[in-house]
Every structure is written in structure tokens, then in C-alpha cells.
UniProtKB/Swiss-Prot annotation:
Protein name according to UniProt: Ribonuclease P protein component
This protein's UniProt keywords: Endonuclease, Hydrolase, Nuclease, RNA-binding, tRNA processing
Family membership: Belongs to the RnpA family.
HAMAP family tied to this protein: RNase_P (MF_00227)
Protein EC: 3.1.26.5
Assigned GO CC terms: ribonuclease P complex
GO biological process: tRNA 5'-leader removal
GO molecular function, one term: 3'-tRNA processing endoribonuclease activity
Length: 126
């Protein structure tokens, strides 16, 4: 995920919380809001201190960023996303995080179908 595709400022996060809709599963809460006139989607990540110390929180953020980068072609442009990690995500692998994010994005109707990985659908690799 490119740096220009990240939400950084508190005002940007607050705008998504106020204007957007939310969806959740056991590991993540996803807020999404349309933002007209953007060339790409933007995403912000929030990992609370309940998750662990700074090393653990930063690892979780890196894994979430990588999972979002893998889904980048499936996320429509003109969206602002805020991803909030819930406790328990720190023990997950990258693949598990990617599947959980895909699930919550489908619930939020951000992604319409399963992304294609290596020519196969439904997330199975091979």
C-alpha cells in the first residue's frame, strides 16, 4: 500500500467515522466512506494498546498493510477505509489476516467478489 494511500490525520479518520458505514467481524471493524474525486482508495489503520506493546502493534499494522496491498486491485477507487484491529489479531498469520479482512470487506460491500489469486477464486492458492 503506497504512502499516499494512507489516512494519517485525525480529521481524516473522524470524517470516515461520521460519514461512513461500518461492518465488523471477530478480528476487525471496518469503516468505509465514499470520497469523490480521488484517484485511488485510502486506508487508515488503528491498533489499540489492548493488542500489545509497540513491537506487537507495529507488526500487526505491517501485516494489515500487506494484506490490503494484496487486495488493492479489488478495492474500488474513491473510498476511504478505516481498519480497527481487535484483540486476538496479534496471533494471526498474514494469510489469516487477509482472509478476515476479505470477509469484513465483503460484509461492508466494499468488495463484490472473491479476488483472483494465481488464477483461482475463493482465496485458495496453488
Amino acid at each position: 500500500m503506497h504512502r499516499s494511500h494512507r489516512l494519517k490525520k485525525n480529521e481524516q479518520f473522524q470524517a470516515v467515522f461520521q460519514r461512513g458505514s461500518s461492518a465488523a467481524n471477530k478480528q476487525f471493524v471496518l469503516y468505509s466512506a465514499k470520497q469523490e474525486g480521488q484517484a485511488a482508495f485510502r486506508a487508515g489503520i488503528s491498533v489499540s494498546k489492548k493488542i500489545g506493546n509497540a513491537v506487537v502493534r507495529n507488526r500487526v499494522k505491517r501485516l494489515i498493510r500487506e494484506a490490503v496491498a494484496r487486495m488493492e486491485s479489488d478495492i474500488p477507487v474513491g473510498l476511504d477505509l478505516v481498519i480497527i484491529a481487535r484483540p486476538g489479531v496479534e496471533a494471526m498469520t498474514l494469510e489469516a489476516i487477509e482472509q478476515s479482512l476479505l470477509h469484513v470487506m465483503k460484509r461492508a460491500k466494499v468488495i463484490k467478489q472473491a479476488p483472483v489469486h494465481n488464477g483461482k477464486r475463493d482465496g485458495k492458492r496453488g
